[in-house]
Regions:
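ATP-binding N-terminal substructure of ATP-dependent carboxylate-amine bond-forming enzymes
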Residues: 1-93, 363, 375-376, 382-403, ...
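Glycine-rich phosphate/pyrophosphate-binding beta-alpha loops
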Residues: 135-138, 274-289
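Hydrophobic anchor at the start of a short beta-strand
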Residues: 26-29, 117, 128, 164
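Peripheral (often C-terminal) accessory segments that flank ATP-dependent C-N-forming ligase machineries
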Residues: 298-414
Length: 414
């Protein structure tokens, strides 16, 4: 199997990593000469794929499938209009993506489908989340605690040309789930838990997520951290499945999407949906359940129906990012990986099972995604923390304590 990946940042890194785990050859096309995914791909073509149709066709038809890993509307539309005509499976649903790329359009869809969601301002009261309709991840997100902060955040976004979404702030654990769908059938995959840095960017993904057997769910830290084995109450994961499936079918999705929710009580409230390959969570799913989402997506497109899957957790996994800079070592959101150089896959990196990193001995500034697995989430977290300490000692870096923030309701997988 040979996969053409268009885009070499966060989503491209995810695609290249999981394609390699499936034993596939990868060809990366990116306009830049040193994107993060370039270090993981078998071949890197530096090009704007839309600039030369003959060359693009040659690249696409030399591969068994094309997976867009970017969010440039022009590029996506160009590929969607051509790749299927060239007879190559196109692992992307442009119509569904266009709906989910707008948070305002998504909220209208949630209302039509009667999907639980945060209340719109002012019904939800304060604090409230103010965010741009079309930005990705944590970009532009503000938690406003009074009307002065709210109006300032709204004014700043409007001045930058954004349509603005203002909705209820929902405290509680943040969960994510991917769904494969095709031809009116949909299959939910493994649920993951998300934790955030001070800028509301996802710094850590944990799998699996469990329900409390009895009594109240585990308390949630200000950064979204909790005992993920008992993160939510009974019935919440089933309700999340139901909401995710309703959205996939409502979108008439032929492909992959991820759904992010906050759980502030007995039901999950859907924050946003993205009809494309996300970053971060698929690797955590792979390490916990063994499900390779890129491989499953290609199989879904090939046979025209999502395959049956066993999403039972085989082990726990923790996936987190660190940055070394100025003599400090910090656990931070995934933005530090988007600005990294070409990444290498390093097994056993300072005690982690694997790392994706642009680290080199003696280099003063670098970033890494650390991946650890264990029998339980508590043991996986312990190992992840031990890895960070090992890095700090070996590299003579000062570890920065993780800053707890208001439990964000944005900034999950990109």
């Amino acid at each position: 199997m040979r996969l053409l990946i268009v885009g070499g940042k966060l989503q491209g890194t995810e695609a290249a990593y999981l394609a390699a785990k499936a034993g596939w050859e990868t060809v990366l096309v990116d306009r830049h000469d040193a994107p993060p995914a370039a270090g993981l791909a078998d071949m890197h073509v530096i090009a704007d794929i839309t600039a030369d149709e003959a060359r693009a066709r040659t690249l696409a038809t030399s591969c068994d499938a094309v997976l867009p890993a970017c969010e440039d509307e022009t590029t996506l539309a160009w590929l969607a209009a051509r790749v299927p005509q060239w007879g190559v499976p196109f692992l992307f649903d442009l119509d569904a993506y266009r709906v989910t790329a707008s948070k305002l359009a998504s909220r209208r869809m949630f209302a039509t489908l009667d999907v639980p969601r945060p209340a719109a301002w002012p019904s939800g009261g304060l604090p409230a989340v103010v965010k741009p309709s079309t930005a990705s991840g944590s970009e532009g997100v503000v938690v406003a605690h009074d009307e002065t902060e709210l109006e300032a955040a709204r004014g700043e976004l409007e001045a930058a040309g954004h349509d603005v979404v203002i909705e209820e702030y929902v405290p509680g654990p943040s969960l994510s789930i991917e769904v494969l769908a095709w031809g009116g059938r949909a299959v939910p995959l493994q649920v993951t838990g998300l934790e955030f840095d001070a800028a509301y960017d996802c710094k850590r993904v944990v799998a699996p997520v469990g329900e409390a057997a009895e009594g109240s769910p585990a308390a949630v830290g200000l950064d979204g951290a909790c005992h993920w084995d008992a993160a939510v109450g009974a019935g919440v994961l089933e309700a999340l499945d139901a909401a995710a499936l309703r959205i996939a079918l409502g979108l008439r999705l032929n492909g992959l999407m991820d759904v992010e929710v906050m759980v502030g009580g007995p039901e999950p409230k859907v924050l946003e949906v993205d009809a494309r390959l996300p970053s971060q969570t698929p690797t955590a799913v792979y390490w916990s359940s063994g499900l390779n989402i890129v491989e499953l997506l290609a199989e879904t497109a090939r046979v025209g129906v999502p395959p049956a899957v066993d999403r039972t957790a085989r082990r726990a996994a923790v996936y987190q990012h660190v940055r070394a800079s100025g003599g400090l070592l910090e656990v931070l959101g995934e933005h530090v990986m988007g600005s990294a150089g070409p990444l290498k896959l390093v097994p056993g990196f300072f005690g982690a099972d694997e790392a994706l990193t642009d680290y080199a001995p003696g280099r003063r500034e670098w970033a890494a995604t650390l991946i650890v697995a264990a029998a339980t989430t508590s043991e996986a977290r312990r190992r992840a923390g031990e890895t960070v300490r090992n890095v700090a000692i070996h590299e003579r870096l000062e570890p920065v304590p993780e800053v707890e923030t208001v439990s964000a309701d944005e900034g999950g997988p990109r």
